[in-house]
Amino acid sequence: MSVAAKKIQDLQKKKEKIALGGGIKRIEKQHASGKMTARERLAYLFDEGTFVEMDAFVQHRCTNFGMDKQDLPSESVVTGYGMVDGRVVYAFSQDFTVTGGALGEMHAKKICKAMDMAGKVGAPVVGLNDSGGARIQEAVDALSGYGDIFYRNSIYSGVVPQISAILGPCAGGAVYSPALTDFIFMVDQTSQMFITGPQVIKTVTGEEVTAEQLGGAMTHNSTSGCAQFISQDDKACIDDIRRLISFLPSNNMEKAPEFGCEDDLNIQFPELDALMPDNPNKAYNMFDVITKIVDNGDYMEYQPHYSKNIITCFARVNGKSVGIIANQPQVMAGCLDIDSGDKCAKFIRTCDAFNIPLLTIVDVPGFLPGVTQEYGGIIRHGAKILYAYSEATVPKVTLITRKAYGGAYVAMCSKSLGADVVLAWPTAEIAVMGPAGAVNIIFRKDIKDAKDPAATTKQKLDEYTTEFANPYQAARRGLVDDVIEPKTSRQRIVDAFNMLEGKREKLPAKKHGNIPL
C-alpha cells in the first residue's frame, strides 16, 4: 500500500469514528427516546447527497477536570451546508450522544463559523438544538461561546432567515439563541425550553411543575408564545422547516422563490357573497375567506395555537409569497389584545425584513377592554402593531370584510398607516365605534327626552347604521380605494399585488427606530 493510500485509509477511519458520535449504545438510546441523531436530522433536512460537513475534526482544548483525556467527536455539534429544494442553507445540529450536546468554546466556534458563512453568502441558517446546556468543565469559555452566538443571532437578524428547532432539552442561557431567531419549532412531548428547571423552581419558590408543563412544546406554542410551530416528531418538524423555507427568500436582498400558479386568476367565488351573517354580532370563520384568496387554498399558519383571535400565516397569491394577518371573528370577536399585539408585530416585521408582501384582512370591533389588559400594558403592546405596519415598506394590501372600529381599525393596516391598496366589501362598517355605542353617545339627550325611548333608539340606530356603518364614508375620503363584490376578492388582490410588484419606498435615515417593547 502506498503512503498516500494508507493516509486515505486513515482518513476514512477517522471520519467513520466521528460519524458514530457517542457510539452505538448512545445512538440506540437516542432512537429509543423517539429522537433522530444529529447526523440523521441533517441528512433528512437537506436534499439527498448535498450535505457538506465543516470542521469535523475540531476538538476542545480544555484540560480541566480530566477533559484533556476526553475525545468528543465533532465537538458534540455537526455543522455544514447543503441544499434545500436546490437552495443553499447552512445548519448546525447538536449531538446529544456526545456529552449530552453540551456547549463549550470550540462547539460554539463551529456554530459561529457556520453563521458567519451564511451571512457572507446570504443563506438561511437552521439550528437543530438538542443540548443539556453549557459544558461546565469549560466554565467562562462556555459562557463566552454562548455570547458569541447571541451576538451573531442579533447582527444577522433581518439579514438571513434564522430558524431554530428544539429537538430535546434547551435550558438556561441556551434558550436565548433560539429566542433571538426568527422562528422556533418544537416537538410535542420531546422538546423542553426553560431558563430554570422544575427542581430549581421547587427549591426557590416551592412550586411543583413537570418539565413538560413548564417548558414543553405546547406550553410555548399556546401559553408563552415563545415558539411558533409544533410538530409530532423529528421528521415532521424537519418537513415543516423545509416547507417554511419555501416561503422565504435566502436573504434580505432577494425575493422569495416563485411557484407556478395553475389557478384561474379571474376566478370568482360566489359563496363569499353569502358568507357574511345578517346579524353583525354573529361570527364566521375567517379561514373561509383566506382559503378563497390564496393559491390552492393552501397556507402555513404561524403561531396557530397562540392568540387565536388573530390569524397569521404564510401563503402564495399568484405563485408569490405573502404574509397574511387577519382577525378571527370566532375567537373574542377578533378583538386585538396584548398577545395579538406581540404576535402581529413580530410576524409583520419578519415579513418586511425578508421582502414578503402583506395582506391584511380586517374584521375588528376594537381593542379588548378590561383591567387585566390595561394593567398588562395593552397600550404598549397594541402600539407594536401600529409601529410594525408603519415601518413596513413591502407592498401592503388591506381588505375590510365587516367591522373596522376605532383605533383597532387604524391599527389593522389602514390607509393612514401606509396601506397601498385598501379594498372593502359592501358589508364593511368603518366607524369610530359600533352603531349601538355611537347612538347612545350622540343621541343620549334625544333618547332620554323621548316619549318612547326604545322606539327612538331603534330609529336613531337605523339612521346611524345607514349613514355611517358602511364603507362609503371612508371611500368618499379616499381611505378606501374601492368597494368590491366579495366574490371578486381573489381577482382584485392578485391585481393589487401585481401592480405593486415594483414598489420602492425609502424611510427617513436613522440609526434604528425605537419600537415600544
Swiss-Prot record:
UniProt-listed PROSITE patterns: COA_CT_CTER (PS50989), COA_CT_NTER (PS50980)
GO cellular component, one term: plasma membrane
Reactions performed catalytically: (S)-methylmalonyl-CoA + Na(+)(in) + H(+)(out) = propanoyl-CoA + Na(+)(out) + CO2
InterPro entries: AccD/PCCB (IPR051047), AcCoA_carboxyl_beta (IPR034733), ClpP/crotonase-like_dom_sf (IPR029045), COA_CT_C (IPR011763), COA_CT_N (IPR011762), MemalonylCoA_decase_suA (IPR005783)
Functional summary from the UniProt entry: Carboxyltransferase subunit of the sodium ion pump methylmalonyl-CoA decarboxylase, which converts the chemical energy of a decarboxylation reaction into an electrochemical gradient of Na(+) ions across the cytoplasmic membrane, thereby creating a sodium ion motive force that is used for ATP synthesis. The alpha subunit catalyzes the Na(+)-independent carboxyltransfer from methylmalonyl-CoA to the prosthetic biotin group located on the gamma subunit.
Family: Belongs to the AccD/PCCB family.
Stated name of the protein: Methylmalonyl-CoA decarboxylase subunit alpha
